[in-house]
């Protein structure tokens, strides 16, 4: 028999969650990543003009590639839960068992740092629109650096606590809730992305194809005091926190009834739709509003730019349009916040099952979901609300997010190279393992170099100050993984070993 043709069994621990959904559940909750277009598209086009379009397209395509790699990994490890970070550990543990534990712990904790802040960020943004629409008081206080209104604080806290309910009630209920939110937000969002097609007189192709920056200079001109390549890498740091987040669908493959089938459908669909929406929304803004108009700093606010865009396309305006856009954005933000509570909680749960995180996170409720891990996310989300603004949250959160994929992509390469005969219901071409390595290298450069440059840029939301302090706060949170790991290894594991009943001694002759 040809040994090379024998099926190899990959040893790994499953998350033990109920398998009660299908590809639609993973896809629709994973739309939380795609919905982040509402925040990043205005920032990109008002910062870089039409030059934002190719940069956004290229980085978003890396997100689709990531989805393809995760589709293969999730189908070959169908019991793992928590998405991307959960697939790193099995790739390393046989060759480097000691190091693999830290790869697993670091990757899951970095992913958590990348995703959980989406809940407070989105609820803060949603509260802004509610305060504006209902003309609520903007009186407030300044807890750290950015002022926050009392109404914003109250709405954000109430919203986060409210979202814990569908998250707690299980994956089936969460899917129904997410489906309703997705239909209410993504259908109008998709229509807005292509609305100019039905009003061709409102679109001006010349605004797009030269890819001019906001000041009228060319695509390869310097900006913000840096060369073109440096500044695009810097903005890629901001982009990766958003445009590759469509990988969130992978968090729920371990809860699908037929993961071998559902993984490739959910993640391919998520990636393809993500590339479409992340590309077409900036294209639509530039086509209709024009590069010169996008220099208006007021358009950084999503509600303002969407209202201005829709008003120009449909030659209308007024209170009704303001309400429609506000409702669409609020619903989109709520869906994304729901995944921020649910998704990375599963990563912490899986890390705890694997033995690198306190046992507290292993607990599941009667609905088969990691309730304590989700409650942990809620608690930290409530604390992060007090930072007051999106800029601060962006800067500290992406210290974890982008780097979390580097060990996973290297792990993909290792599994394809050293474990080629593991059953893979969905298998990419062999040469894709080198693409995975190249993607890991790109993400690392964006993370380490792009992050340093981006957080050094002056930010108008902070009165011209940079966000470097929040970048280093993110590093501090990232390194806090170590005491939690040591607590599990030095305190909990010895304690449980002492309490475990001794093994039965076989009787003589048995």
Outline where the language-model segments fall.
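Membrane-interface "cap" regions at the ends of multi-pass membrane proteins
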Residues: 1-53, 63-71, 99, 481, ...
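Extracellular loop-to-transmembrane helix junctions
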Residues: 37-146, 151-152, 470-479
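Membrane-helix boundary/coupling elements in multi-pass transport proteins
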Residues: 82, 110-128, 243-256, 319-358, ...
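Hydrophobic, membrane-embedded alpha-helices of multi-pass small-molecule transporters
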Residues: 21-38, 43, 156-159, 217-288, ...
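TM-loop-TM module centered on a large, flexible mid-protein loop between adjacent transmembrane helices
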Residues: 85-94, 100, 132-137, 213-223, ...
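A generic transmembrane alpha-helix motif of multi-pass inner-membrane proteins
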Residues: 51, 177, 185, 192-199, ...
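Helix-loop-helix connectors at the membrane interface of multi-pass transporters/channels
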Residues: 86-99, 123-152, 188, 251-260, ...
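Hydrophobic alpha-helical segments and their helix-loop junctions in multi-pass secondary transporters
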Residues: 128, 183-217, 284-289, 410-422, ...
